Swiss-Prot record:
Pfam families: YqjK. It comes from the Bacteria. GO terms for cellular component: cytosol. This is Uncharacterized protein YqjK. InterPro entries: YqjK.
Length: 99
């Protein structure tokens, strides 16, 4: 008889523990959603802009086909900016090593 009572007591204890774990999980879930909410909103915004990026890249492709010199001009500018950035970066590193 005592084993049956002991089993019932253990069962009640386990059910209570399970209920507490569920409450803890629910609270943790709420905290997690509040913490990551800003990232979720930004990610959803980025996903919604994906279709506009596709349209924009298509327009740029058509524009480049019609005006190829503009593409060459912007490629030269981009390469010039990249080269200038590398020059500034290496110069700053050399000055830091000296001083």
């Amino acid at each position: 008889m005592s084993s049956k009572v002991e089993r019932e007591r253990r069962k009640a204890q386990l059910l209570s523990q399970i209920q507490q774990q569920r409450l803890d999980l629910s609270a943790s879930r709420r905290e997690w959603l509040e913490t990551t909410g800003a990232y979720d909103r930004r990610w959803n915004m980025l996903l919604s802009l994906r279709s506009w990026a596709l349209v924009g890249s298509s327009v740029m492709a058509i524009w480049t086909i019609r005006h190829p010199n503009m593409l060459v001009r912007w490629a030269r500018r981009g390469f010039g900016v990249w080269s200038a950035w590398r020059l500034v970066k290496t110069t700053l590193k050399q000055q830091q090593l000296r001083g």
